[in-house]
């Protein structure tokens, strides 16, 4: 089994809304280590994910997504802290700009004391990202 550890967030793509006072948002599951876990699982590799994930709406969606992709979520720590958001906006030339909302968020608050005392015996590789 490959264990990936790190970011679990939503990329939120912001575009002009239907009026001058609105913005259209499209949120997608993201985070490099989370994406690695999903990609490995899709390739048939047994995979687990270790992070701290919120109990908020976004966090529940992250867990549901990982489970739907057959990624083991048993090592995930749950919390009331909010989910990290990465806002992506395009300028007039289509160049993206990024704003990260990470202050006090779940995946940034994993403490050493919350790590498992021992990894499952099946873990052969650990990937830690961003």
Where are these regions (language model features)?
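Glycine-rich phosphate/adenosyl-contacting loop at the front of the ribokinase-like
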Residues: 1-71
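Conserved N-terminal subdomain of the carbohydrate kinase-like
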Residues: 46-130
């Amino acid at each position: 089994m490959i264990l990936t550890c790190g970011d679990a967030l939503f990329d939120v793509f912001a575009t002009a809304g239907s009026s001058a006072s609105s913005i259209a948002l499209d949120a997608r599951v993201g985070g490099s280590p989370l994406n690695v876990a999903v990609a490995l699982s899709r390739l048939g590799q047994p995979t687990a994910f270790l992070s701290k994930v919120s109990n908020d709406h976004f966090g529940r969606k992250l867990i549901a997504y990982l489970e739907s992709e057959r990624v083991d979520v048993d090592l995930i720590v749950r919390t009331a802290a909010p989910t990290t958001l990465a806002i992506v906006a395009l300028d007039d030339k289509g160049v993206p700009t990024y704003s990260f909302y990470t202050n006090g968020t779940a995946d940034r608050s994993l403490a050493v004391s919350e790590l498992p005392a021992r990894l499952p015996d099946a873990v052969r590789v650990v990937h830690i990202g961003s």
